[in-house]
């Protein structure tokens, strides 16, 4: 009888997991001077998240592949192991491993070193912010007055404009943490704090990063003119990429599209370049090349780990004409910065340059629409940003123009400037860049047009400011 009872007890422990109270869990009581305590909660020392009484969560065990189900009970987390399977779709960013609970609908991410958060979205090594800090995902949690920030998930913030339980909280960087964020485009990251017994928002003391090297170059004045633009050197456009694809029915490869280096391991391009489906290992990206097929002394070549085409790309209107390629490398860094290879700066979400601002495009495309071949040398063109009123169907032979597009064209004409600068076939996926704050900044991706170099007919580009969230989210997947 005793043996039977022991056997049953052992089965229960194996099936359900041994419930226990972790000594490292601490009771979390937040107090405001002169006010009442507003709730005892549990703080998970592994995930650094706080939970309300009776709230439950999953967490990965340290140094193992097991997962625990925890519940906050009177200030202590009571946990037991539960069975899990690999998630059916990617949910974790920055290389995290996703585990789906077998008996209930919840998942947990096992994060690599340097990342934490529900989806490994928090970068524990981020010590400063860039621009206004809209994309800051670090762990700074102190306001300028040295007061500790309040957790965005706190019930005290339920009626506040921004909190960790609002529908788009995750995209704004909000969640179960008290880290400084900038969900509303303020001048810098901020958080909610309690001062003199009252709630208020306050800017954080997180430092701004030193100015990045993105968008810098050693510009060489073009010496030779060509139909549709000017022959140039890669050092004038070090963010220019060339994408090649293997031939399907013969050996060798063919030039596919242009691309734009936006970080060490990521290249931005146009979605319509992949209307024919390719496997990632059928693609190659070349950086630092002045001549389309002739190798350069400082060029860098990469295989493609994966590529992501916007799910809502419309191959009829070319709406959402954007795609990302992740370069393959044996180390965390892919492209090595040099005079011939450098990332372009991405714009701030609210960047709006004046109408008719002069910008540049570059690519290895055809000289004109009737040309049988692509250009052998990289070319550049100088165009101006059109007002939205001129970026409309009636100026583009009644073709559809959406809010995700912008227009730019060469406004020079006449006998003095018979050569109208414009993008053409083969330039697709390449950059439209403009000077902003002394750095060249990406405004558009070469997408489509009516002919090439037609007088008073602008080229159409994917509007990059509309896709900053999409770019950030997919780079972290």
Curated annotation (Swiss-Prot):
Q: Which CDD domains match?
A: EGF_CA (cd00054), FN1 (cd00061), KR (cd00108), Tryp_SPc (cd00190)
Domain called Fibronectin type-I: residue spans: 40-82
EC number(s) stated in the UniProt entry for this protein: 3.4.21.68
Query: Per UniProt, what is one GO molecular function of this protein?
Result: calcium ion binding
Q: Where does it reside?
A: Secreted
Domain note for this entry?
The fibronectin type-I domain mediates binding to fibrin, and the kringle domain apparently mediates fibrin-induced stimulation of activity.
**Subunit structure, as described in the record:** Monomer.
This chain's protein is named Salivary plasminogen activator alpha 1
Native source organism of the sequence: Desmodus rotundus (Vampire bat)
